[in-house]
From Swiss-Prot:
Enzyme Commission identifier(s): 3.1.26.3
Assembly description: Homodimer.
Signal peptide start and end residues: none
PROSITE patterns: DS_RBD, RNASE_3_1, RNASE_3_2
Gene: rnc
Names of the cofactor(s): Mg(2+)
Family, as annotated: Belongs to the ribonuclease III family.
One GO BP annotation of this record: tRNA processing
Domain RNase III as annotated: residue spans: 7-132
Protein name: Ribonuclease 3
Keyword annotations from UniProtKB, A to Z: Cytoplasm, Endonuclease, Hydrolase, Magnesium, Metal-binding, mRNA processing, Nuclease, RNA-binding, rRNA processing, rRNA-binding, tRNA processing
Gene Ontology annotations for the cellular component aspect, listed alphabetically: cytoplasm
């Protein structure tokens, strides 16, 4: 088990104090370190995914009471996808608290998007089991607040607009490529390039990959409008 001080430090970053710290320890334990006497976070990940989904479904419904299902679904998906969970995990430096086996440690597991996203969902489940749905809901809404606002502001976002522009001209959908990543593991900066099948492209950078993609799409739309 992680030393108590390390769990306490992570609870400070998380903004939630566990009545049962063993739940948090389990949520932070990857299967590469599990054993018959020490479980991993896979079952908690399964539960946390459902808790996150319910909270986000409520959030997108509350944010736009007139929106139809067809417009709500993309917003919901943007909030619950693994990349979003991993971004939140990086913000609270969850990677530093993860308990990994030697193989995952040497493979850079603390930085891997899939592992971070899974662990974030497991932590949500641990909070749910420790303090109930209200505690889990408060945690998720606090950690996802900027994303919820951003998704609502970008209900018809630049990526969608660029894709529609391309489709209207019989072109393939735009492609997005991560061309660079800098900064510390817990606060990376992503640089992304968007490219049309006709060759036009633009690059942008941001602290979240989705934001970089949005900005690149916005810049390319502006470039196309000026032609």
């Amino acid at each position: 088990m992680k030393p108590a001080r390390e769990l306490t430090a992570f609870m400070d970053r998380l903004g939630y104090v566990f009545e049962d710290p063993a739940l948090l320890a389990r949520a932070l334990t990857h299967s590469s370190l599990s054993s018959p006497t020490r479980g991993d976070n896979q079952r908690l990940e399964f539960l946390g995914d459902r808790v996150l989904g319910l909270v986000m479904a409520e959030a997108v419904l509350a944010a736009d009471t007139d929106a139809k299902e067809g417009t709500l679904a993309p917003r919901f998906n943007a909030l619950v996808r693994k990349e979003a969970c991993a971004d939140v995990a990086r913000q609270i430096d969850l990677g530093a608290a993860m308990r990994l086996g030697k193989s995952e440690m040497s493979a850079g597991g603390r930085r891997r998007m899939a592992l971070l996203g899974d662990a974030m969902e497991a932590v949500i489940a641990a909070v749910y089991l420790d303090g109930g749905f209200a505690s889990a809901r408060d945690l998720v809404l606090r950690l996802w607040s900027e994303r919820v606002q951003s998704v609502e502001e970008d209900a018809r976002d630049a990526k969608t607009a660029l894709q529609e522009w391309a489709q209207a001209r019989g072109m393939a959908p735009p492609t997005y490529t991560e061309v660079a990543r800098s900064g510390p593991d817990h606060a990376p900066v992503f640089r992304v390039r968007v490219t049309l099948s006709s060759g036009e492209n633009a690059e942008a950078q941001a602290k979240a990959k989705r934001q970089a993609e949005q900005q690149a799409a916005k810049d390319l739309l502006a470039q196309l409008a000026g032609e």
